[in-house]
Amino acid sequence: IIIGKTDSELLIATNYHVVDGADTLSVAFADGSAYEATVKGFDENEDLAVVSVATKDVSNDTMDAISVAKIGSSDDLKIGEQVVAIGNALGYGQSVTTGIVSAKNRKTDSSGQIESSDSTDNSSSINKGVNLIQTDAAINPGNSGGALLNMDGEVVGINSSKLASTE
């Protein structure tokens, strides 16, 4: 998710677990081009990272084809609202799926397990894990770090988890 652009770099938000332990990074764009990237910062607890790509390395065609994402507010999402998940499902290239918001403010514990909580209670301080937006949009391996968009095209979340089992 391109969140910033200066004369010298593109700033891209992704998940921390995507870049964790990487010695080198390569960012692939929708036009098929790929460029070396460096980690600018991260928050392991929130599973967020920002990487940068030097604009001097990026072709003019690629620069012309990209834009900085519009950031929305996940607080404004409503249960039942439609969302779009963008990613690179299974590493096959850009993918887009749609779904609805099933719940908000889901919590995970340190092992990544979903903790039971009241999905409408924003004030809970008992669960200190990451807040999650639950959606039925297909999120597959490779979608991590991709954008979750509202129907106005604004980023309201970053795809990061797939619950593989309900047991």
Task: Please tell me what each predicted stretch does.
Residues 1-167:
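Serine-dependent protease modules
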